[in-house]
């Protein structure tokens, strides 16, 4: 078996109806589109609005991340894609078709085009790996020979071909999630929804699952839409990201752009664990003015990804003059862009603080003078 046997020609967008308005090229490529989407629940104390006027497009074949604090509306949003949640207002379009008025038969067909995996694996403990994956095909009335072929291919794809007789209790968390992924792929979906799919896994297992999702995305052309509270997951796998707060979009864009230079306070808070904060020991020593001739000026340099090249540290240090020490930081690449932060201590330079800041600005997109230390 080859993964190629699972590949298929992705359907074209629905044909344009007579008199239908020509769409912007970006929207023509959109596989999932939310237009003015709202969702209200009836709570004990009255109506609770989970989503407010969401306008968002997700392109075919991309890995799209949705982040936000608890209660921001993330799960409500993705569950409208397969109509597990019915919007209170607005529309959801898949391949430019409004799914709002689908009858039961069309909903069943839609849900087979959309796979879903969860934080909790939802496997049947009394069934083997093979039968857990096979069950949706059996329910759909797929002939036995076709079921066997499909299950065999999928277990090979997710790296579990030698575990087909095992029961869930005999599997690790990562292996259970691989079964969940295989089960989500049985109907050759075009879209895969991931709701906190790695939250219950250890870091090493998380990386292996992310590697599998990347492979599925690249080889099968699958659109992946994922929710996570782990910002490193978004950084490692997503093409674009949207930030929700109280059911509203507060920021969206390419991952490198949002991570490199977050604009909204919610984004900054969510991404703070990935940032290099000022060490407490250094913070306690910082002073606003130099107290001796050997005091060092502390600069914070941020690289927000607008350059594809890593900073030339030798040239930077030379331009600052004096003795330059790297206190903390690093630069990494996200989607080919250089992002990161450096904390530098500059001692004995003939340049004033404003001049040092200006010089450093030739390499870094954001430069801040933090103070002086001895």
From Swiss-Prot:
Give EC number(s), comma-separated: 7.4.2.11
Please tell me where ATP binds in this chain: 68-75
Q: Where does it mainly reside?
A: membrane
Q: Name one GO cellular component term.
A: plasma membrane
Subcellular locations according to the entry: Cell inner membrane
- According to its UniProt entry, this protein's organism is Pseudomonas fluorescens (strain ATCC BAA-477 / NRRL B-23932 / Pf-5)
Q: What does this protein do?
A: Part of the ABC transporter complex MetNIQ involved in methionine import. Responsible for energy coupling to the transport system.
Family annotation (InterPro entries): AAA+_ATPase (IPR003593), ABC_transporter-like_ATP-bd (IPR003439), ABC_transporter-like_CS (IPR017871), ACT-like_dom_sf (IPR045865), MetN_ABC (IPR041701), MetN_ABC_transporter-like (IPR050086), NIL_domain (IPR018449), P-loop_NTPase (IPR027417)
How is the quaternary structure described?
A: The complex is composed of two ATP-binding proteins (MetN), two transmembrane proteins (MetI) and a solute-binding protein (MetQ).
Q: What is this protein called?
A: Methionine import ATP-binding protein MetN 2
The similarity annotation says: Belongs to the ABC transporter superfamily. Methionine importer (TC 3.A.1.24) family.
According to the lineage, what is the superkingdom? Bacteria
Membrane topology designation:
Peripheral membrane protein
Region described as Disordered: 1-22
Q: Tell me which UniProt keywords the record has, alphabetically.
A: Amino-acid transport, ATP-binding, Cell inner membrane, Cell membrane, Membrane, Nucleotide-binding, Translocase, Transport
Where the record annotates domain ABC transporter, the positions are: 32-271
Q: Which Pfam families match?
A: ABC_tran, NIL
Reactions it catalyzes = L-methionine(out) + ATP + H2O = L-methionine(in) + ADP + phosphate + H(+); D-methionine(out) + ATP + H2O = D-methionine(in) + ADP + phosphate + H(+)
């Amino acid at each position: 078996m080859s993964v190629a046997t699972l590949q298929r020609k992705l359907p074209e967008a629905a044909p344009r109806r007579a008199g239908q308005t020509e769409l912007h090229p970006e929207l023509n490529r959109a596989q999932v589109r939310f237009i003015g989407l709202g969702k209200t629940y009836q709570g004990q104390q009255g109506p609770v609005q989970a989503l407010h006027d969401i306008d968002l497009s997700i392109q075919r074949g991309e890995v799209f991340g949705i982040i936000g604090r608890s209660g921001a509306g993330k799960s409500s949003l993705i569950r409208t894609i397969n109509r597990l949640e019915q919007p209170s207002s607005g529309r959801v379009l898949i391949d430019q078709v409004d799914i709002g008025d689908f009858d039961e038969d069309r909903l069943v067909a839609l849900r087979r085009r959309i796979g879903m995996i969860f934080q909790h694996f939802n496997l049947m403990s009394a069934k083997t790996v093979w039968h857990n994956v096979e069950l949706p095909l059996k329910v759909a009335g797929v002939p036995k020979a076709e079921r066997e072929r499909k299950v065999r291919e999928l277990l090979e794809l997710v790296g579990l071909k030698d575990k087909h007789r095992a029961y869930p209790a005999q599997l690790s968390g990562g292996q259970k999630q691989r079964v969940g992924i295989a089960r989500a792929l049985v109907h050759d979906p075009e879209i895969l929804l991931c709701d906190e799919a790695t939250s219950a896994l250890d870091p090493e297992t998380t990386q292996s699952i992310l590697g599998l999702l990347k492979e599925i995305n690249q080889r099968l052309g699958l659109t992946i839409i994922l929710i996570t509270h782990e910002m490193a997951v978004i950084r490692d796998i997503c093409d674009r990201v949207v930030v929700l707060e109280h059911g509203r979009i507060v920021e969206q864009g390419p991952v490198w752009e949002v991570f490199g230079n977050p604009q909204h306070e919610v984004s900054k808070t969510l991404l703070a664990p990935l940032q290099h904060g000022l060490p407490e020991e250094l913070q306690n020593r910082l002073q606003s003015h130099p107290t001796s001739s050997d005091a060092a000026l502390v600069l914070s340099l941020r690289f927000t990804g607008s350059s594809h090249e890593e900073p030339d540290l030798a040239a930077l240090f030379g331009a600052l003059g004096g003795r330059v020490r790297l206190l903390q930081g690093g630069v990494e690449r996200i989607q080919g862009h250089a992002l990161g932060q450096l904390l530098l201590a500059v001692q004995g330079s003939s340049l004033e603080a404003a001049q040092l800041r200006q010089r450093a600005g030739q390499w870094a997109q954001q430069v801040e003078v933090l103070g002086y230390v001895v």
